[in-house]
Amino acid sequence: MFNLRNFDVIVVGAGHAGTEAAMASSRMGCKTLLLTQKISDLGALSCNPAIGGIGKSHLVKEIDALGGMMAKAIDYSGIQFRILNSSKGPAVRSTRAQADKILYHETVKKILKKQNNLLILEAEVKDLIFKNYSVVGVLTQNEINFYSRSVVLAAGTFLGGKIHIGLKSYSAGRIGDKSAIDLSVRLRELSLRVNRLKTGTPPRIDINTVNFNNLLIQNSDTPVPVFSFMGNVSHHPKQIPCYLTHTNEKTHEIIRKNLDKSPIYTGFLKGLGPRYCPSIEDKIVRFPDRKSHQVFLEPEGLSSIKVYPNGISTSLPIEVQEQIVASIKGLEKSKIIRPGYAIEYDFFDPKDLNLTLESKLIKGLFFAGQINGTTGYEEAASQGLLAGLNAALSSKNTEGWFPRRDQAYLGVLIDDLTTQGTEEPYRMFTSRAEYRLSLREDNADLRLTEIGRKLGLVNDSRWIRYNQKVLNIQTEMNRLKKNKISPISPDADILKKLYNINLIKEISMSELLKRPQIRYQDLQSLESFRTGIVDLEAIGQIENEIKYAGYIKRQSEEIERHLKNENTFLSSIYDYNKIRGLSSEVVKKLNDYKPISIGQASRISGITPAAISILLIHLKKESYKHTL
């Protein structure tokens, strides 16, 4: 063994969590080492070829607002962009993009290679190095020590990973890559709570064997959306469609007859899978009355021959997979070029983490991504960014940062994980956020970019553009308030004729925009509108802020009330056994979870309002004692 180098931060794993962690820490000026089994797999889209979706896109926008790279990577590699829930309110509208897998990986690789303070090496980590209950480095399989002030573990499905196809299984981190067995064994020797989860993927189909005739076509939206606040439609490669087909009774019968060959239904596979992304076997068993299920045929790239049949994730034997595929319209003669499979892997109880994603048990050790019990690229990447920036702050002996639930979807994600934990892969949805009208996609930069700048994550060009956008929005909103329309003006006649609006008194453009049938583009057709702005992103924010001003104000007032509990800290309480009046169940949960505030304590299952009242009384008494 020999001492090769010293670093501020070491990141283990280079998937979506690891790459964002490494970028965040290096952008903050920390000397960072990113270790991966294969540099050729940096930021690989291991499963579905898509970024975004309901709730997930909000995380991508927040990563971007904090200077992360996921939004930029998908803008340069996305081959189909759509806005989901476009007919619904702005709180739940979500961008989703199909990715060219090769272009996405190449973009991530290019961004990482340009980053200062970052060294990327191929090496498998087999152990952590400790000193006085703190992590101080890692040991690789080839017996090299790397030392650091903090370590981020972002190993994805590689820790104890086991692939299942039918009743056969073998160790692997994903198909074609070996599992990190030694590190898994070592981590299980520590005082960390470990369990198993599983996820799955469908077979890949040769695009040349698919009959797309008579299938429903899905093109990109017009205008084509962008993800990054620094992005532009011109960054997108060529746009191509996806197609929709369905399973049928024949498909379902094939699956029912072969459930005895499923590792899930024969007990070979113990880990719980994602509730909201079930295998086709699960769908057939859980919804026996359904006559069909959607299958989206998603190309994996402009030059790839692989099609991803989204909706038929399976771990049945390959010969059964072939029967399933052949039973589906358009796929009757299709050829499988890679089988579907399930993968079981280690995850660590996220309740053992602080809100900064640092272990409560081992100083300097941070966890990010699927090993925290989440599923999805976006959930992993956002955790990676948070873990990376906090690993950087920790290496500088600086207090960590995390967003609150009212500040970001990332705040919701982290609070849910560390407060409630999870027994199945956790996926983000807009429904998980109680303040979702304030946490829209379009205002992620307004919520987080200033914070990112203070942390050292946001560069000068992004900061200049952000400030110009804020100025444009404020200037235009003020102009709309001052710009009036008279009931005797030609514009009043236009409003009556086109929108059935009968003005009886002077009205501002801002008041007019509050009406549900009026959009900003409608105002532009009025003579008194004069010159507005052309930034579609800013226009969207202006519309939302004006149209939903009343709701946003009420939500802001609610947030203010809740902040009182979030800012009432419990750090002075070391042992809840000493507080009289708490039940033994409540004491055990509080001692186990160690919530940082009254707000977090109130979200722990089983912590009653009465228990919260006792805690508040205790804090008040302690505060009074200190004033004497």
Curated annotation (Swiss-Prot):
It comes from the Bacteria. Keywords: Cytoplasm, FAD, Flavoprotein, NAD, tRNA processing. SUPFAM superfamilies: FAD/NAD(P)-binding domain. One of its GO terms (biological process) is tRNA methylation. One of its GO terms (molecular function) is flavin adenine dinucleotide binding. Pfam families: GIDA, GIDA_C_1st, SAM_GIDA_C. It is found in: Cytoplasm. GO terms for cellular component: cytosol. InterPro entries: FAD/NAD-bd_sf, GIDA_C_N, MnmG, MnmG-rel, MnmG-rel_CS, MnmG_C, MnmG_C_subdom, MnmG_C_subdom_sf. Its cofactor is FAD. FAD binds at residues 13-18. The keyword NAD applies. Its main location: cytoplasm. NAD(+) binds at residues 273-287. The keyword NAD applies. PANTHER family: GLUCOSE INHIBITED DIVISION PROTEIN A (PTHR11806), PROTEIN MTO1 HOMOLOG, MITOCHONDRIAL (PTHR11806:SF0). NAD-binding protein involved in the addition of a carboxymethylaminomethyl (cmnm) group at the wobble position (U34) of certain tRNAs, forming tRNA-cmnm(5)s(2)U34. Belongs to the MnmG family. Homodimer. Heterotetramer of two MnmE and two MnmG subunits. This is tRNA uridine 5-carboxymethylaminomethyl modification enzyme MnmG. It comes from Buchnera aphidicola subsp. Acyrthosiphon pisum (strain APS). The gene is mnmG.
